[in-house]
């Protein structure tokens, strides 16, 4: 049986704050897209649809999850790797919900066939605060052993290496957030949850007015960075586009030190021959 999970992200381009990835596992088919891409919705519309998504999950029609990557992780590893982390963490939340819910029917029977040792391993893996790539691969292997194959559909045209980590098909869909209802839901989940976080961060860092621009590179935000300097949640990797002082200076090649040697003594001709 396939577990088809639909994925989209929010917060790829901002100068500050985390990246968020939303994920949706439908338990019924959605033929009409009532959700739309989060980018073309107003904040009020997104909030209303997010509440509808929560209600849809409470009716057992979907399971949803999310994953994040911090600004520090973006600086350390780059955006592609951060997206991989976010996708894997979102998938982990979905699989944890699947495991805990023991969905009725074929999926439930598969989970019930999980032996005690596998169950303990899964619980320990789910409890880890920072799951490694190896741990996520192990979770996917256990589900695969139970006859539950993962299949991911991601908005855009890149897999971020998730297919290699989870050893599962990953379908990329350009403009998927406008075409596929479940990807639209994932887009709204990621956007709304990230906005909530940025509003809260605005209380901790009032000098940047995060509640207004959500960390994106507006002129106001850039002016505030120039005035106050960057905070610890700003992405130094992204700031260099606007602030030359964040560009890495090329390292000067090390010059080899010349070792002074004593002058060689000339040997007499007889010594050279023998």
Where is each model-derived feature located?
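RNase H-like, Mg2+-dependent phosphodiesterase core
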Residues: 1-274
């Amino acid at each position: 049986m396939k577990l088809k999970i639909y994925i989209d992200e929010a917060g790829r381009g901002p100068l500050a704050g985390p990246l968020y990835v939303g994920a949706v596992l439908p338990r019924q088919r959605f033929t009409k897209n009532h959700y739309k891409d989060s980018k073309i919705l107003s904040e009020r519309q997104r909030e209303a649809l997010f509440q509808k998504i929560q209600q849809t999950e409470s009716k057992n029609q979907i399971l949803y999850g999310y994953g994040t990557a911090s600004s520090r992780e973006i600086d350390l590893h780059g955006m592609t790797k951060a997206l991989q982390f976010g996708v894997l963490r979102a998938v982990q939340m979905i699989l944890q919900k699947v495991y805990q819910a023991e969905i009725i029917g074929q999926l439930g029977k598969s989970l019930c066939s999980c032996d005690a040792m596998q169950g303990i391993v899964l619980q320990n893996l789910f409890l880890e605060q920072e799951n490694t790539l190896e741990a996520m691969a192990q979770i996917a292997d256990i589900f695969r052993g139970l006859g539950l194959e993962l299949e991911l559909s991601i908005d855009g045209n890149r897999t971020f290496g998730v297919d290699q980590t989870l050893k599962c098909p990953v379908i990329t869909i350009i403009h998927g957030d406008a075409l596929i209802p479940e990807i639209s839901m994932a887009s709204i989940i990621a956007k709304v949850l990230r906005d909530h976080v940025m509003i809260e961060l605005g209380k901790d860092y009032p000098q940047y007015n995060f509640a207004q621009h959500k960390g994106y590179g507006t002129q106001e935000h850039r002016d505030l960075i120039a005035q106050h300097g960057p905070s610890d949640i700003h992405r130094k990797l992204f700031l260099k586009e606007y602030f030359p002082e964040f560009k890495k200076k090329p390292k000067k090649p090390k010059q080899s030190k010349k070792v002074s040697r004593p002058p060689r003594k000339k040997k007499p001709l007889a010594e050279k021959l023998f």
